[in-house]
Amino acid sequence: DVCSSDLGKMSSNTRFALNTWYAVALVNDGSTLTLYINGEKDNSMTVAPYEYALYGVQIGMPSKGYQSSQLFYGRLSEMRLWTRPLSAREIKANVCGVDPSTNGLVSYWRMNEGEGTTFYDLSPSKRDISYKNGITIDWTYDDTNKCLE
């Protein structure tokens, strides 16, 4: 499952292959949550209206109603949060990166520091993510340009 709400759960329709890079985007326009895989619409669900607020983001962690066997076992290359819903065209155009000063970009973590326990936010808001309490990051290096594949 990609996410769940009081209105139900949403899963991807994509059969993910091992050792394959995917660009995953979730867009919430206030009434519909849409999942994009590699810039193409994959699935969507109705969601309740919301007020913009960042209460917390869980990636790869079991949440209410999920089993520990559903943990995310993979690698992340970057993560972005926006204050506005992006169009499919914008998602596709920004798969390989985005200008940190782009209108509506709240946070942009490239996750390419290579050492330490902090992901630095390149956006003007500077919401760095630091891991504490013995949590470590397993840094890996991959010089393959996924955007050219």
Residue locations for each model-derived region?
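Single conserved hydrophobic/aromatic residue that forms the stacking wall/gate
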Residues: 1-3
